A protein has these predicted regions:
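Nucleotide-activated sugar donor-binding and catalytic core shared by glycosyltransferases
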Residues: 2-444
Length: 444
């Protein structure tokens, strides 16, 4: 984008007019959807007023952090902890119940002390956002990862609230898609006050999109908390039930990848059996909980000895029957919020999403645990740190057939944990860099 072009351009003004009209038309459908989801999870409708920006008036201006869901909130946690050291209260906003619950879990003390409020993001239209701004009077806002909400960006600009992308990344795939569109939410990005991004490559992307102030701050996910009880539970199970057995975790496997993933497991298990070798244990963690039942049925149709986490482990991850775990071919990870446990168990992590052109899911958790990683051919969404990790030798980009051949001919752990740890250490310090960038952007 030409930075000399007045913002917003006529194109953007027309897009915003259409966007507001669509919101007015679709709002009843959105509310109906929330009530439908509320049948299973009442939290979708319990705080419906927050979706309209309805809050009691706060006495002090707040720092506003928008973390759409669980992953974004966890990556923001070290930054939030640092910001809580100031006298300014914080409001975190979320689109999903998972993000809100995680904020309430991580910052229980700050919430009870009145230093932090967790709530839903208002619907992305003017009246709801104005009510939210009036209640919290944000000093500035941070949009975690990449969020191009036209209403948020333009209403913040109108109210002169500095708004920044934080831990930002914008994939080549998304840029190519959005450049082909006459109307794209990304065209409102020049309305941001700045962006703090993961790499120099990402900095160039945001500058091309018209964002004036850009700082490279690294990957915040490398600094998120690692739940030590989950790591300790995995260590105990490896010691008591698995000994030196190779463990491979397939995590965040999405719809469209299951058939090939299960074929990989079957081929590898058959090969090791025929060779008279100890078979690896595969841990299979679907991306979406609603798929747990379907995947269980698919595994049951195969010649596997398998079990589910819900049947073999207690709530605090203690083994109910160690002998059953020793004999497993596949452990189905049918639980939420325990990814660090499943990854801590393994020697190698295979991360889904990139095997069916949907874009790979996050690899940072596995790397933080010192695990080498394999991803599918499509890496958009995690171009950083995937490209750097591949160059460093701690990540491989392969299809399922290539991974199968690799596992048949090589040790699963293709690089040492020390090498992975060194890679993560080389990209640390994101929280401090982000704090410095915020100060620079606000007080140039």
């Amino acid at each position: 984008m030409d930075n000399t072009t007045p913002f917003p351009s006529l194109n953007v003004r027309i897009m915003l007019l259409l966007y507001r009209s669509i919101w007015l038309v679709c709002l009843p459908l959105v509310i109906a959807y929330l009530f439908l989801r509320g049948w299973r999870d009442p939290i979708y409708v319990k705080y419906l007023g927050e979706r309209f920006g309805i809050h009691k008036q706060r006495m002090k201006p707040h720092i506003w952090i928008h973390a759409v869901s669980l992953g974004e909130l966890r990556s923001a946690a070290p930054l939030i902890e640092e910001l809580l050291k100031s006298d300014t209260p914080i409001v975190t906003t979320h689109f999903t119940p998972a993000g809100r619950r995680e904020s309430e879990r991580l910052f229980t003390t700050a919430i009870s002390d009145g230093r932090l409020t967790a709530c839903y993001i208002p619907f992305d239209y003017g009246a709801a956002l104005r009510r939210f701004f009036k209640a919290f009077r944000p000093k500035y806002g941070l949009l975690m990862e990449f969020e191009a909400w036209p209403g948020i960006i333009m209403n913040s600009r109108k109210k002169q609230i500095p708004l920044f992308i934080c831990n930002g990344a914008y994939s080549n795939h998304s840029i190519q898609r959005d450049q082909k569109r006459y109307f794209s939410p990304a065209k409102t990005l020049p309305g941001l006050s700045g962006a703090m991004v993961k790499s120099e490559f990402q900095a160039d992307q945001f500058r091309q999109l018209g964002v004036d102030k850009v700082a490279v701050t690294g990957e915040m996910r490398f600094e998120q908390r690692i739940p030590t009880p989950q790591v300790a539970a995995a260590t105990a199970i490896r010691k008591e039930a698995l000994n030196s057995r190779t463990v491979i975790t397939l995590s965040s496997i999405v719809f469209g990848e299951d058939t090939d993933a299960l074929q990989l497991i079957e081929t590898v298990q058959t090969h090791f059996t025929q060779q008279g070798l100890a078979k690896p244990l595969f841990i299979y963690v679907p991306r979406a909980p609603e798929r747990f039942g379907l995947i269980s049925d698919m595994i049951a149709a195969k010649p596997f000895i398998y079990g589910m986490r819900s049947n073999l482990l207690t709530e605090d991850l203690k083994m109910i029957c160690p002998e059953k775990i020793k004999d497993l071919d596949i452990l189905l990870g049918n639980s939420l919020g325990e990814m660090y446990f499943y990854l801590s168990l393994c020697d190698l992590a295979i991360i889904g999403g990139g095997f069916c052109k949907k874009g790979s899911h996050n690899i940072s958790e596995a790397l933080c645990l010192g695990k080498p990683v394999m991803i599918g051919p499509t890496d958009y969404g995690i171009e950083f740190p995937a490209r750097e990790a591949i160059e460093y030798g701690v990540c491989k980009k392969l299809d399922f057939e290539q991974i199968t051949q690799f596992l048949l001919n090589n040790p699963a752990q293709f690089c040492a944990s020390d090498q992975v740890d060194a890679f993560v250490a080389s990209h640390s310090g994101s929280t401090d860099k982000t704090m410095a960038a915020i100060k620079l952007f606000l007080d140039p």
